Design a protein with these regions (language model features):
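Cytosolic catalytic domains that perform sulfur/thiol-centered chemistry
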Residues: 1-277
């Protein structure tokens, strides 16, 4: 099929490699690899990336930097807009993002763009889903015009809102961080937000890093009480992997939940907030 096939006005939160091949000439492909252990995402990109993909520096463009609002608060809208513009992402662009972690990192970029009403999707399966050869050539996109806009309040929940939240709070972290049996150096306390339930985002994926069948993902959320019409807030350590749960919810027809961007790194920093274990 022709690679220049027209892109629909709206796209799902996940697309596969065949979709990307059909539409690649009309898409900005974004490599959003980033590693919690400090390994270089840029280095991974330089060693091999999907042809024509641009590298998105999470620390520079997708995070406001560690501070009172957690380890990775949402960036200033003007900073995000400058980053997108420099990467060739304009107001009318379609973006397909990937990583090498099943999408749990690249989901941050996709969620941010979709929250602003842009066309963006995760490449299901990440870089391994690309059927062709990888490239090492640097990519120098022509700058585009991306208009800065405030992060929509209707897509977010802040720490002070959680106590009165009447819906379901879903923690996307691994079970051992949720139950407090593991406390990372970046965790101010061990445990989780009182009343939260646990759906580890990586359990949305199968053994090769692709999204599990819709029925299985829905069942995982149903086990913690999330059903059609449920009001959901998603959080994680710092607002990155929580975005994968939000995209998964949308993908399986459970609606668009809200993001608590500060995550555990903000919530637990306040000694007045007592962790549940």
């Amino acid at each position: 099929m022709d690679a220049t096939q027209a892109i629909p006005d709206s796209i799902p939160p996940f697309v596969d490699g065949a979709w990307l091949q059909r539409h690649r000439d009309g898409v900005v492909v974004a490599d959003a690899r980033w590693y919690l252990d400090g390994s270089s995402g840029r280095g991974a990109y330089d060693r091999g990336h999907i042809p024509c993909a641009v590298f998105v520096d999470l620390d520079a463009w997708l995070s406001g930097g560690a501070g009172a609002k957690g380890l990775n608060p949402l960036p200033d809208p003007a900073v995000f807009a400058r980053g997108m513009s420099s990467l060739g992402v304009g107001d009318d662009s379609t973006v397909v993002a990937y990583d090498d972690a099943g999408g749990v990192i690249a989901a941050r970029l996709v969620w941010m763009l979709r929250a602003l009403g842009k066309r963006a999707a995760l490449l299901d399966g990440g870089i391994a889903a690309w059927p062709g050869l990888l490239d090492r050539d640097p990519v120098h996109p022509a700058p585009a015009s991306f208009t800065a806009a405030p992060w929509p309040e209707e897509s977010l929940v802040q720490a002070d809102d959680l106590e009165a939240w009447a819906g379901i709070v879903v923690d996307a972290r691994h079970a051992d961080r949720f139950d407090g049996s593991l406390q990372l150096p970046t965790d101010p306390q061990a445990g989780h937000i009182p009343g939260a339930v646990n759906v580890p985002c990586r359990e949305n994926l199968d053994s090769v890093g692709r999204l599990r069948p819709i029925a299985e993902v829905r069942e995982a959320f149903a086990r913690v009480g999330v059903r059609d019409g449920s009001a959901v807030v998603s959080y994680c350590g710092s607002g990155i992997t929580a975005c994968h749960n939000l995209l998964a919810l949308e993908h399986v027809g459970l609606g668009r939940g809200l993001l608590y961007p500060g995550g555990w790194s903000e919530y637990a920093e306040d000694p007045r907030r007592i962790a549940e274990r």
